[in-house]
């Protein structure tokens, strides 16, 4: 599916703010903590040699490449992401059992029913404004008894970067350009996740809240992470000159959080494994 064929879901973040710079930043930044959390999620999911696995919201393909090694030559991994620039980077990771396509979680039309043993979504679910359609699509492409693994932001646990950014954006002159709802995330809590599983054909085998620690070496690194991981939506609603000012203000306020080890955020992450009924 080409990028021009993607269907925008009401309230979803913009896909037009990504850039080569942000995509390469994301490749570099996600190679540490986010990739490691994805590796742990693959363990929770119990990925086995010979299985067919869908990495939904695969980004630049680091986790998909790792899973391709886990499933081995008799298995298969397909990575799907709505951002063409990130899929372009992902396709540089060449494996005979690994492929990537531009597409979105709401419309997996290119994938056949009951064609996967497992689906993994790492750091993706909180971007969906409407949750049931992606879960129903996952249920459709999974075989009966197939597993879905989700690692996502826990509701009510925003990073310090986003807390400070929200305060800055509520002040003049930035408040003249309110951030669209589509440029915010849509996290859930454990009970909401359980309910979503139940209504979309999954039995929960694991729903767990885990402690999570993030560290950024500098205020600039924290801002760049937020921009890259949000594919430009972090401050993308501001005119260019105000975006520069907002970045400078956020950077200045983040400086007060610096320790000898950098800016440290202790948060919580929601991990869920569902089995298709």
Describe the role of every protein-language-model region.
Residues 54-56, 60-108, 133:
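Class I SAM-dependent methyltransferase SAM/SAH-binding core
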Residues 132-147:
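A short glycine-rich, Lys/Arg-flanked "PGG" loop and its adjoining helix->strand segment in the class I
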Residues 118-131, 154:
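A short SAM/SAH-binding and catalytic strip from SAM-dependent methyltransferases
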Residues 2-51, 62-66, 86-89, 93, 149-175:
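Conserved class I S-adenosyl-L-methionine
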Residues 7, 11, 15, 60-62, ...:
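Conserved Class I S-adenosyl-L-methionine
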Residues 42, 65-68, 135-139, 166:
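A structural alpha-helix within SAM-dependent methyltransferase catalytic domains
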Residues 106, 110-119:
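A short acidic, Gly/Pro-enriched loop at the edge of an enzyme's catalytic core
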